[in-house]
């Protein structure tokens, strides 16, 4: 007996893509004329990016370079909290810790399920921890749900994984 088609909605970042974007941004920062002699760098930790530069203006330029490289690599910028405060670091440098969103919280999963229910399609959305599983009889209904989620203006990044059909 065949199982109904389904997929999961998650908010997970592809680490290799992020590392590639950061290394490309660092390469550009090291070769750009306006960054010569500056101590600008980007580090990746488990749940955040640490951006360091000599002043706030250069830090904003580092953010611009990084976001450009991430957009080119297909990384959703909504997965990052670039609104965090700039703090003084060692010496004459400033630092910004950018939080990386990993997984959906309860409020975000509720937003997704209510959006799916408002579509009035023959699909079921169930919350499974930090993801939402969508099951339906027809693949066309699932594709409509995916299109609705892509078009929705959420303040977080939603990805689709675990396709079964």
Curated annotation (Swiss-Prot):
- Offer an example of a GO molecular function term for this protein: nucleotide binding
The UniProt keyword set, sorted, is: Nucleotide-binding
Membrane-spanning intervals of the chain: none
Q: Which SUPFAM superfamilies match?
A: YajQ-like
Q: GO cellular-component terms in the record?
A: cytosol
Q: Which organism is it from?
A: Leptospira biflexa serovar Patoc (strain Patoc 1 / ATCC 23582 / Paris)
The entry's protein name is: Nucleotide-binding protein LEPBI_I1392
Function according to Swiss-Prot or TrEMBL = Nucleotide-binding protein.
Ligase among the record's keywords? no
Record's InterPro entries?
Answer: DUF520, UPF0234-like_C, UPF0234_N, YajQ-like_sf
Q: Does the keyword Nucleotide-binding apply?
A: yes
Q: Which Pfam families match?
A: DUF520
Signal peptide range in chain numbering? none
Tell me its family: Belongs to the YajQ family.
Q: Which domain of life is it from?
A: Bacteria
